[in-house]
């Protein structure tokens, strides 16, 4: 993995992360590639693309997490975006704690190992189907890159949120048709086009709330 690519990408995103944090992000990328050879955590195997498509894509949402202290990452697979966000949090959002909810055992096992190896005190792994999770304290927000349909995202995760909590959907092209299919009781409150360095594709962060 190119540390220079990561450093340049962070600068283009306007993120000022310490050298120690950048080193931990690089260590996570190495760990992801190592486990991916056996566990098939991601289809992306090129080291440079791991930086752009996974690390920088995940971190592009950081400026939009103001006011959020508890964040649930649903269906994060290899820990994306949850682990990069947890790694960067001490430099940008010191109060942020991330909980990853992952159904697949091998993916949850990888995330737990990453937590241990990277010393992530602000990251928790829950190996369970999202609909079965009943948190003691509900979350400020829930985020996901995994859902192909906003309808499913809000339907399966609404019970995780505190009153006034937000859904953060990381999408590619603007999901006009998906928004039109949202059930009554949910609305889009913010749309943020994201420019991810090195990723030649549209990205949007769609923020939703209950009415």
Swiss-Prot record:
One of its GO terms (molecular function) is rRNA (guanine-N7-)-methyltransferase activity. It is found in: Cytoplasm. S-adenosyl-L-methionine binds at residues 75, 80, 130-131, 145. Its EC number is 2.1.1.170. InterPro entries: rRNA_ssu_MeTfrase_G, SAM-dependent_MTases_sf. Its main location: cytoplasm. It is an enzyme of class 2 (transferase). GO terms for cellular component: cytosol. Keywords: Cytoplasm, Methyltransferase, rRNA processing, S-adenosyl-L-methionine, Transferase. It catalyses: guanosine(527) in 16S rRNA + S-adenosyl-L-methionine = N(7)-methylguanosine(527) in 16S rRNA + S-adenosyl-L-homocysteine. It comes from the Bacteria. Signal peptide: none annotated. PANTHER family: S-ADENOSYL-L-METHIONINE-DEPENDENT METHYLTRANSFERASES SUPERFAMILY PROTEIN. Belongs to the methyltransferase superfamily. RNA methyltransferase RsmG family. HAMAP family: 16SrRNA_methyltr_G. Specifically methylates the N7 position of guanine in position 527 of 16S rRNA. This is Ribosomal RNA small subunit methyltransferase G. The gene is rsmG.
């Amino acid at each position: 993995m190119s540390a220079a690519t990561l450093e340049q990408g962070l600068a283009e995103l306007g993120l000022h992360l310490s050298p120690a944090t950048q080193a931990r992000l690089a260590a996570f990328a190495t760990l992801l590639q190592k486990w991916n050879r056996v566990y098939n955590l991601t289809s992306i195997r090129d080291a440079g693309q791991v930086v752009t498509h996974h690390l920088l894509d995940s971190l592009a949402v950081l400026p939009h997490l103001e006011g959020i202290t508890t964040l649930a990452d649903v269906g994060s697979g290899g820990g994306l975006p949850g682990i990069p966000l947890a790694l960067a949090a001490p430099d940008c959002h010191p109060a942020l704690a991330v909980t990853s909810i992952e159904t697949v055992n091998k993916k949850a096992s990888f995330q737990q190992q990453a937590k241990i190896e990277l010393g992530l005190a602000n990251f928790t792994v829950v190996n369970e189907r999202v609909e079965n999770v009943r948190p003691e304290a509900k979350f400020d927000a829930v985020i996901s890159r995994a859902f192909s349909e906003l309808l499913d995202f809000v339907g399966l995760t609404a019970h995780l949120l505190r009153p006034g909590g937000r859904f953060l959907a990381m999408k590619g092209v603007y999901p006009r048709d998906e928004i039109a299919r949202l059930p009554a009781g949910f609305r889009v409150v913010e749309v943020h086009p994201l420019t991810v360095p090195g990723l030649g594709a549209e990205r949007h962060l769609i923020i939703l709330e209950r009415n």
